[in-house]
Amino acid sequence: MQISAYLCALIACCGLTLSAPTANNKSSSEAPPLLLVSFDGFRADYLNKYSFPNLEKFFSDGVLVHELTNVFTTKTFPNHYSLVTGLYAESHGMLASIMYDPVAKKHFSIKNDSDPFWWDEATPIWVSVEESGYHAASAMWPGSDVNIQNHTLKYTFKYDSRVSFKERLGNITQWMTTDKSLKFASLYWEEPDFSGHTYGPDNTTEMARVLKEVDGHVGYLMEELDRMELWGKINVIITSDHGMAQCSEERIIRLDDCVSPSSYTLVDLTPVAAIIPLEDKTTVYNNLSSCHVHLKAYMKNDVPDRLHYKNNERIQPIILVADEGWTIVKNGRLPRLGDHGYDNTLPSMHPFLAAHGPAFRKGYKMSSFNSVDLYPLMCHLIGIPPKANNGSFAHVRCTLVNEQCGELALAVGLVMGVLIILTTFTCLFKLMKNRNVSSPRPFARLELDDDGDDEPLLE
């Protein structure tokens, strides 16, 4: 009886734990605003190699995710769109910095990016926010100034690299404080990507200089939010789209040395080249396959599934992927000392993530999660339903102060295991006890009573 009582108490406790609500059930009207900031090309391991006093202050009172596994190709436009849609590039259609759509016969480049045609295959979070009856804002996030699915942001302005970080942030904080229905804002900054391309990530002198500037922007961000009485009241996420790899003149792959220039059209260049064969596709593919030991060639349908880069009409018939640090050119020289776009399993391609605000744990660190997981997290923070996506809220819920996560699940599992063992032993104990006190005549229970009872087994 005593063991049974203990079991009942344990089961009751576990029942309460398991049935307790795990979601942040705040409606979007109650949820604080969310600010998403991207520092383009911020490689994850910069955090280990350089000093970031302001950024460290930011995540010491919040969350740090050491690495994000981003999407392939590890380029700016595909990854910024994945962050706000939760989709792989093949799903949202923003596949590269230069694209060609063979059905519409249209060309895309970063200098010609305002046609909604290229963006309408997905729904970015700012569209969902406005569909929910709230407002969103953006300071130069890729695609934020485009009319997507017949939605144009109320608060935005076109990309202009001459606009300072302070001015971009100033617009965001002004909009947030004057419009209480503004629930989401995004801000984009070009560095350290620009310097990484120009000098290469191995140039520690130049990278130390630009990363000090970036850390200064983080410091200003905290000061400005505090001045506007937003610090600690809104949720802030700082992240990036990709990392950066060092390139050199000694690591160049010249395609014209392998195939006739007249046999192919090059849509996107390096380090992932998109090829349209103008002659026999198999011949062109075979020549490219044997072109260089540091170059992998794939027919579109043979691109590895893990890259999620085959199921879209904008992906060209032949895809070339250079090894880390190698550069693909037609016949020219090295275009830049640093580059990205390589295989998304490479640590050099990974960005980081830091978060701060009332929804986030304090001093919490994670090793990694997928960049597409950020989208369902942001929808949860704002309190809006996510669109279909490739991410998982379960992967990121441990970052939140009100969420149960892996440690608790393990503890509950251990308790349940102990309960099963105790229950088994209790049942065996009772069976043995009943057997010891039972009648010596094994068939006595089957004897009928004198009153004609015909249900002897239903005692």
Curated annotation (Swiss-Prot):
Cofactor stoichiometry and binding remark: Binds 2 Zn(2+) ions per subunit.
GO molecular function: bis(5'-adenosyl)-triphosphatase activity; metal ion binding
Protein origin, superkingdom: Eukaryota
Entry's EC annotation: 3.6.1.29
Residues at the catalytic site: 76 (amp-threonine intermediate)
Binding residues for substrate: 159, 193
Family stated for the protein in its record: Belongs to the nucleotide pyrophosphatase/phosphodiesterase family.
Record-given protein name: Bis(5'-adenosyl)-triphosphatase enpp4
Organism in which the protein naturally occurs: Danio rerio (Zebrafish)
